[in-house]
A protein has these predicted regions:
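Active-site Tyr-X1-5-Lys
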Residues: 132-156
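Conserved Rossmann-fold NAD(P)-dependent oxidoreductase catalytic core, especially the SDR/UDP-sugar
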Residues: 93-134
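N-terminal Rossmann NAD(P)H-binding glycine-rich loop of SDR-like oxidoreductase domains
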Residues: 3-23
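Flexible, glycine-rich beta-alpha linker
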Residues: 117-118, 156-174
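Mid/C-terminal beta-alpha module of Rossmann-like enzyme folds, strongest
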Residues: 212-273, 302-312, 316-333
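NAD(P)H-binding glycine-rich loop region in Rossmannoid oxidoreductase-like domains
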Residues: 49-87, 101, 119-123
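Conserved C-terminal active-site "lid" loop/helix of NAD(P)H-dependent oxidoreductases
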Residues: 199, 236, 258-300
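Substrate-positioning beta->alpha
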Residues: 169-174, 188-211, 219-220
Length: 333
């Protein structure tokens, strides 16, 4: 395979690049940020997917047989202006044009998100959307653009759940740092079922989609990640690996009050370990339908314990020296 990865400098992209390199595939990462892993820099081409001419040149020169489209703005901070996520839906349209103009492309994976459906909404079919954030809406538009593109290659849409693992700067900065200092408290012992995914399993699932027979993958939508589980199991495993101790629990109302305080800090630009959004994600079920993914792709290879061990090893192996990518202005031309 000759695999072109958009957004290969990010969290999932860095892990995917490592996997494909180890598998001996020819790989090109097109991203407007440099790779998190300096060792992958030789395979990076600086490129804004909103730049159609540069994108077309990259395709023409590399001649990929397979494309994995990960590039996106993935936060949920913007609540008023959908155009803040223009690189998601419009960027995907431009990527699709580049794919259509490149006859070597045999397969395409387009990345959406579980947030095209709000928590509690179990979609009846692939077009049963219920986004609850502008980010989720931008990904709904991404999915529709893919369906309407009339692609001649095999295409598949993936919807990642909450993904964790090595190279996640969000978990490094928000959860791990607080937990290692002994400042993490979990809100109550109530069972909360969440759809999470170890990044190694997600990369394995992407690889399966690239390799399985085209007729089984074409036009399909798959949630990628692990089967839903009790969030406490994951939190306890991380705590024991990081600190050697079980998690400490405090009443839900205390954490809710801290979250409100965090909201105030956030409005003035000050960091705080918990906000109302984070509180809701820690105390609300969010279950995605993984059965179809497992049936089509098979069970993923890594256990939760293996994933936690790999992530903590990465965290303790110099992750503090990895800088956050610079914020850039999206080109609309």
């Amino acid at each position: 395979m000759r695999v072109l990865v958009t957004g290969g400098s990010g969290f999932i992209g860095t892990n995917l690049m490592e996997h494909l390199i180890d598998a001996g595939e020819e790989v090109l990462n097109v991203d407007w940020n440099p790779p998190l892993d300096p060792g992958q820099r030789v395979l990076w081409r600086e490129l804004d997917i909103m730049d159609e001419e540069a994108l077309a040149r990259a395709f023409a020169e590399f001649r990929p047989t397979h494309v994995v489209h990960l590039a996106a703005r993935t936060d949920t901070e913007e609540q008023h202006d959908l155009n803040a996520y223009v690189q998601n839906h419009e960027g995907t349209r431009r990527l699709l044009n580049a794919v259509k103009a490149c006859p070597s492309v045999e397969r395409l994976i387009v990345t959406s998100t579980q947030f095209v459906c709000e928590a509690g909404h179990q979609p009846k079919d692939d077009l049963d959307f219920k986004p609850f954030t502008l980010y989720g809406e931008s990904k709904r538009l991404t999915e529709m653009a893919t369906r309407e593109a009339r692609l001649s290659c095999t295409w598949t849409i993936i919807r990642p759940t909450t993904i964790w693992g090595p190279w996640s700067l969000r978990y490094r900065d928000v959860m791990f740092k607080v937990m290692r200092k002994g400042l993490y408290f979990h809100p109550s012992r109530r069972k909360v079922i969440r759809s999470y995914g170890y990044v190694g399993n997600v990369v394995w699932q992407i690889d399966r989609i690239l390799r399985l027979p085209a007729e089984r993958m074409n036009g399909r939508v798959f949630y990628v990640g692990d089967p839903p589980f009790d969030l406490r199991i994951w939190v306890e495993a991380v705590s024991k690996a990081l600190t050697g101790r079980p998690v400490r629990y405090i009443p839900t109302w205390v954490v809710r009050a801290l979250a409100v305080t965090g909201d105030v800090f956030r409005t003035v630009g000050l960091p705080f370990p918990i906000t109302s959004g984070r509180f809701r994600s820690m105390t609300s079920d969010y279950i995605t339908p993984m059965d179809r993914t497992i049936e089509a792709l098979g069970p993923a290879p890594f256990t939760l314990e293996q994933g936690v061990k790999a992530m903590v090893t990465w965290y303790d192996g110099g992750s503090e020296h990895i800088a956050h990518p610079a914020r850039k202005v999206v080109g609309h031309g």
